[in-house]
């Protein structure tokens, strides 16, 4: 892979964290009719963002065959910082990401590695859900 901006930061969030957020929202919608029609963002705190290079280093520990090179190109505009404002979800729903950014990257890379090598994804998915439930 070619990496253009290794020091750019990216939010890391696992799909299980997002699904958990929607389950919390659904339960709150049932209890509080004032929330009907409200919109919510679910994303990690900006302080949890990782640099692209750090995401790659974590990924390489899980999948040693991963290779990349840095090639700074100016022809593509790319934001150095990406983020969602999830303050409303945190305040009203008392929601937060349960997985760290490092756990998110590790679980995601582990899943894709097993998928790539045609391993039992259902079993791994169940293990990862159990891991999340124990957080």
Where are these regions (language model features)?
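C-terminal substrate-binding subdomain of Rossmann-fold SDR/epimerase-dehydratase oxidoreductases
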Residues: 2-135
